[in-house]
Every structure is written in C-alpha cells, then in structure tokens.
C-alpha cells in the first residue's frame, strides 16, 4: 500500500515538472517579447524623422510651438469636422502623434462658416476668437513648380483660380511676357489666401504645381521663386 502511494506521488511529480517547465518557458518567452517590443518601439520613436514643416493645421491653430503645447490630443476637432478632412497623426505621419492635421492634396478644408472644429477645441489650441473663416490662416498657396504649370507652358489653365473659395481675391491670373508670348500666370495674394488647399487639390497635374504650405515657409518659398532660387522646402 505504502509502495503504491509512493509510486503514484512519484508519477504525479514526474508529470507536473514538465508542465511547470513549459509554463515557465512560455512566461519567459512572453516577457522577452514584451521587453524586445518595448525596446524596438522606443528605438523606432527615437529614429522617427523630425516633424515636417509642411504640416497643415485646422483653422485657428496657434503658432506651431504654442499649438503643440496647448493641444491635448483629444480629437474633438476631428470628430466635429463634418467632412472628415481632419485626422489625428499616427507615428507614421509627418506631425507629432495625436495632433490634428489635414493633407490638402487629399482633401482641402471646406471652410465651414460656423467653423465647428474651432468651437470643439477645449483648450484654445484652435483660437476661439476666429469667427470669420475668411480670416483663417492655415497656410498660403505657392506656385512651387513653374516648369510644370501649364500656364508657364503657354497653355490656358485657370482651374486653381476658378475653384478658389475666395474667388477673384486670393488667387488670380496676371499677365507676364516671356519668349513664349504673353502668359497668364496664377498669382496668390498672401493677405487673402486662407491656406484651405482647394487649389492644390484640384490642380490637374499628377503632382500639383501649386501647393499650400504653412505661412512662414510658404512666403519663404514664394520669395525664393521670385528671386530664381531653389525653393527651400524641397
């Protein structure tokens, strides 16, 4: 009797030990994966390039440094955008993670008269004093590529002028004489342009010749183009 019980205990112990070893091995593997994942994730975030200077923010956004400090990444402005233009940046986007931005070439700001994104912001990162969408300053449109713009080739394209929400004020065609003759060149009035991106969205070229850039950068590019220098954003 005693011998049988001893054999049973020995048999049970023999079965339990491999199970415990398997559980320990699985636990060790999971911990290892978690540690490696954490290290890899941290390294990935550290290796991310600095946020691009070409990111476009919602209407009423404060200056970029102040905006990043005030924005709590709540996503309320994104939720309240009726056209789903705004999105929150992921780690792969050219903006700090969780901050709202839009890509004009994909979808421009529709310039809602009631500016719901501004009203939704709880912190003032989108300035509540902005009540007239025509006073928004999301950026400025710049003709960044004279070589591909159809008007510089002597053709008559006026798409960017015709689709502009502030038609006849923010962008117009100005006559310029060159070896090809009298050209009608898209010209942006930076004091009237809101940076909505409608012109960039509707440019008929595969890569838009006109782009919307944050105002400081855009004015620098415009000045470089006028002086015949290489645009600073390229």
Swiss-Prot record:
Pathway: One-carbon metabolism; methylamine degradation
GO function terms (MF aspect): 4 iron, 4 sulfur cluster binding; metal ion binding
CDD domains found in the cross-reference section: DMSOR_beta_like
Chain positions recorded as [4Fe-4S] cluster 2 binding sites: 109, 112, 117, 121
Residues at which [4Fe-4S] cluster 4 binds: 193, 196, 199, 203
Keyword Electron transport: yes
Keyword Transport (UniProt): yes
Keyword tags: 4Fe-4S, Electron transport, Iron, Iron-sulfur, Metal-binding, Repeat, Transport
Binding-site positions, [4Fe-4S] cluster 3: 149, 157, 160, 164
Residues noted as binding [4Fe-4S] cluster 1 in the record, renumbered to the chain: 71, 74, 77, 81
Domain named 4Fe-4S ferredoxin-type: residues: 61-91, 98-131, 140-176, 184-215
UniProt function note: Involved in electron transfer.
Protein name: Methylamine utilization ferredoxin-type protein MauM
Gene field: mauM
